[in-house]
Amino acid sequence: MVAQIRIGQGMDVHAFEEGKFVTLAGVQIPHTHGLKAHSDGDVVLHALCDALLGALALGDIGQHFPDTDPEFKGADSRVLLKHVYQLILDRGYHLNNADITVACERPKLAKYNLEMRQSIADVLNVDLNQISIKATTTEKLGFTGRQEGILATATVLISH
């Protein structure tokens, strides 16, 4: 039997607001600001959720967890990711790998890379080498360059 392979891509953006940390990939990272959001504002996990949902044409994170629903106010995005991944598993698919890029000037993320990757691997119950996270800047261009927020993109490969 030939394996069925699907690719999904997701993106998320959140603006900065008052706060003392940002949550990225389920990891609290000290910062001069937080992220404005209905849930915990974890752009990494939101982009990953959208990539997984997109791979099987299951809609997007806003359809599954609307920001108008008080149930998801302040929600831990690791719980959302676990729910989304269960939808993938229920359809007989599994994650081959995820490649994630985070764009921001600050906070600097290099020292949190392994912890963020491990956090995702733990939620999805996959090997660490299946999760890649890269951080970049936009060379001071655009809203991330002006330090107004953070952007994350995620690409996944899943197979049946």
Swiss-Prot record:
4-CDP-2-C-methyl-D-erythritol 2-phosphate binds at residues 12-14, 38-39, 60-62, 65-69, 136-139, 143, 146. One of its GO terms (biological process) is terpenoid biosynthetic process. It catalyses: 4-CDP-2-C-methyl-D-erythritol 2-phosphate = 2-C-methyl-D-erythritol 2,4-cyclic diphosphate + CMP. Binds 1 divalent metal cation per subunit. SUPFAM superfamilies: IpsF-like. The record marks H38, T137 as: Transition state stabilizer. Pfam families: YgbB (PF02542). Gene3D superfamilies: 2-C-methyl-D-erythritol 2,4-cyclodiphosphate synthase (3.30.1330.50). Pathway: Isoprenoid biosynthesis; isopentenyl diphosphate biosynthesis via DXP pathway; isopentenyl diphosphate from 1-deoxy-D-xylulose 5-phosphate: step 4/6. GO terms for molecular function: 2-C-methyl-D-erythritol 2,4-cyclodiphosphate synthase activity; metal ion binding. A divalent metal cation binds at D12, H14, H46. Its cofactor is a divalent metal cation. Its EC number is 4.6.1.12. Keywords: Isoprene biosynthesis, Lyase, Metal-binding. Homotrimer. NCBIfam families: ispF (TIGR00151). PANTHER family: 2-C-METHYL-D-ERYTHRITOL 2,4-CYCLODIPHOSPHATE SYNTHASE, CHLOROPLASTIC (PTHR43181:SF1). Belongs to the IspF family. Involved in the biosynthesis of isopentenyl diphosphate (IPP) and dimethylallyl diphosphate (DMAPP), two major building blocks of isoprenoid compounds. Catalyzes the conversion of 4-diphosphocytidyl-2-C-methyl-D-erythritol 2-phosphate (CDP-ME2P) to 2-C-methyl-D-erythritol 2,4-cyclodiphosphate (ME-CPP) with a corresponding release of cytidine 5-monophosphate (CMP). This is 2-C-methyl-D-erythritol 2,4-cyclodiphosphate synthase.
